[in-house]
Amino acid sequence: MAMFTTMTALTLTSLIPPITATLINPNKKNSYPHYVKTAIASAFTISLIPTTMFICLGQETIITNWCWTTTQTLQLSLSFKLDYFSMTFLPVALFVTWSIMEFSLWYMASDPNINQFFKYLLIFLITMIILITANNLLQLFIGWEGVGIMSFLLISWWYARTDANTAAIQAILYNRIGDIGFILTLAWFLLHSNSWELQQVFLLNNNPNLLPLLGLLLAAAGKSAQLGLHPWLPSAMEGPTPVSALLHSSTMVVAGIFLLIRFHPLMENNPPIQTLALCLGAITTLFAAICALTQNDIKKIVAFSTSSQLGLMMVTIGINQPHLAFLHICTHAFFKALLFMCSGSIIHNLNNEQDIRKMGGLLKTMPLTSTSLTISSLALAGMPFLSGFYSKDLIIETASMSYTNAWALSITLIATSLTSAYSTRMILHTLTGKPLLPTPISINENNPTLLNPIKRLMTGSLFTGFLITSNIPPTSLPQTTTPLYLKLAALTATLLGLLVALDLNYLANKLKVKTPPPAFYFSTMLGFYPNIIHRMIPHLSLLMSQNLSLLLLDLTWLEKLMPKAISQHQTSASTTISTQKGMIKLYFLSFLIPLLLTLLMIS
């Protein structure tokens, strides 16, 4: 076990020198990005040793190195939990990040601040590793906030663009809503368990209150972009493509699902929170799939596919299968990073064109990118024997076996079919047909820093699911004993979506342009959610505050007290004065007649 913990600690500490190098020598040379890439590749190689030892021994470990602080009743220590989840995810995250770093050498070659960009990506990875290896809630919260702030910095990397700044602010604000739930959970456990160590929290709360679990679900919904807190995820595409690849594959967006996986010993005894997670995930996966159907930006399509897969992971949490959700996180990391890399390769070679309607014919001009895009899209759709199949098919089989509501299962199957449909649509628009770009361009697919990471991730997308399920079997995976028609449900849904997309694409080429129906606008405008939340509600609140200040203050109190009051007094005075006609004889006569009458009465 000493060897196991030593090699794991070496893996974690090998990522620190590139950060300290920037503090010692701020004027970094051009070799710094290569240094960071090599450090991550070395960390990945080292991490294979403790992961292999864990597979052989199967014994989880908790390393407690240093006591941070001690109050009267609470002790906080720096502790790492090296169990099935962290030891499996560590090499996956390092491998994917290594490939993304090498891809960034090609994609960001002309950026003057590429050294800082690589440093930010490395810190992003380190904060995610802190999150997955944390053994107490405070350490987990540090990693949680770390991925949040690094996502803000990386999404707004091109800070001169208004859209990039707006997207970064959206990401940080929506995540602050989720952080409210996390802090609520922290406070509840401190008050009731007097500890933030995970093993003590699980031991003392066999039947926990609904409140901390609701806080955890809110935190996960914010970080993993579930319905209601989802608009920041497609907006985050304003960042560079390597940022999108890292953000969506193995870091920030899966952090919320990973949080619920960590706390599954508490959730498995609480049916209401499981039902809530199931329904939330089912609605999210269907909504995101519907939105992806009509998007024309290639990165937005991949972003909504991420949101849909996160909903599927939430469904898996809801049917009490955390190991299955974790398996899908691991397989999803490979093909999602590959999808973004292929998108980045296409965008870069087509002079930053992202509209799939202006692409076409790339199958011959970019063969490796086209092959990789097809493989990753099929893995996303759950095509048999690709990496996504081993997790996605098992999720749907388990959901069909579980004693849960058929409504959630039905819309999950519909979302699976739609996933196949929008993946096929993207492939047909980008790779087949005639080139639709208005100007001739020079396509170069021969750079090794582009080809090598794509080849590595393509290999991962082909074989990772098989390797993980064969060599690292979790003890709680369900043994599915379903009838044949249920066994083929997921595959049938995938093939149905594929055929529908092919047929619709064939028909669309012969249709005349007409006014689209309202349902089309629901999909293209993302369910009108951004218009309502980001436009209508702020507009109504600003209008109400303007009317209050205008009607109550300016038009009522101020005018009644000052201008209108003075005006009314002056008007009445001037009216009184203006009634005087200046006829002095008549005035004296009117005075004299009453005087004479009075004298006569007296006498």
UniProtKB/Swiss-Prot annotation:
Top-rank EC class of the record's enzyme: translocase
Pfam (any one): NADH5_C
Listed EC numbers: 7.1.1.2
Single GO MF annotation: NADH dehydrogenase (ubiquinone) activity
Annotated membrane topology: Multi-pass membrane protein
Protein's GO biological process: electron transport coupled proton transport; mitochondrial electron transport, NADH to ubiquinone; mitochondrial respiratory chain complex I assembly
TM spans (from-to): 4-24, 38-58, 89-109, 122-142, 171-191, 211-233, 241-261, 273-293, 301-320, 325-347, 366-386, 405-424, 457-477, 488-508, 537-557, 582-602
Organism superkingdom: Eukaryota
Catalysis: reaction(s): a ubiquinone + NADH + 5 H(+)(in) = a ubiquinol + NAD(+) + 4 H(+)(out)
One GO CC term, this protein: mitochondrial inner membrane
Alphabetized UniProt keyword annotations: Electron transport, Membrane, Mitochondrion, Mitochondrion inner membrane, NAD, Respiratory chain, Translocase, Transmembrane, Transmembrane helix, Transport, Ubiquinone
Protein location: Mitochondrion inner membrane
Assembly and interaction partners: Core subunit of respiratory chain NADH dehydrogenase (Complex I) which is composed of 45 different subunits.
Family: Belongs to the complex I subunit 5 family.
Known role: Core subunit of the mitochondrial membrane respiratory chain NADH dehydrogenase (Complex I) which catalyzes electron transfer from NADH through the respiratory chain, using ubiquinone as an electron acceptor. Essential for the catalytic activity and assembly of complex I.
Protein's name according to its UniProt entry: NADH-ubiquinone oxidoreductase chain 5
Organism listed in the record: Pongo pygmaeus (Bornean orangutan)
Gene giving rise to this polypeptide: MT-ND5
